[in-house]
């Protein structure tokens, strides 16, 4: 093992938890990226959701990589439903309204992971998961929001799939880790190939 330094360019608690639980030693370094401006510019150019997620993940990764040695992991996730792109809800009221719209419907999570070194992207992985929400009652939703609190504001969908949020769904097609925001298994494969972690 070469012991290449691994850096996570994300403040996401669940991404940190996934890497930690996998036994990976890493540092967390984040640099602000104007996600709204990048997204607006790409939408104006007619970019696909996949390209937008990829550009955001790359921007986060490259920005940190330009000033720090090692392999820098950047990630982004975008939710789409009925052709509309969604950002993280900013309040519990907004989260409730969104979840009410989502019940009984299908939405997609488009994810990208980009690993950079010396200021350049050297690896990327895209994921797409399809999630069907069950037609839950408003009473259930109120209980869910009360139990979860503001933790649901950390997710673009307004749910923590790894927790009580799993009760919102009737069917899911795709990778569990990708739903949480980091396609962990492909990332681990790349880190092994690079000798950053043991084979």
Model-derived regions: residue spans:
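N-terminal polybasic phosphate/anion-binding patch
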Residues: 1-71, 139, 146, 192, ...
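Short, active-site-adjacent cap segments at secondary-structure transitions
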Residues: 15, 78-81, 86, 116, ...
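Residue-level signal for inorganic ion chemistry
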Residues: 19, 57, 76, 95, ...
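Short beta-strand-to-turn element immediately C-terminal to the catalytic PLP-Schiff-base lysine
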Residues: 80, 114-117, 134, 171
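Anionic-ligand binding region
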Residues: 100, 112-116, 120-124, 128-129
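Active-site oxyanion/phosphate-handling segment shared across diverse enzymes
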Residues: 124-198
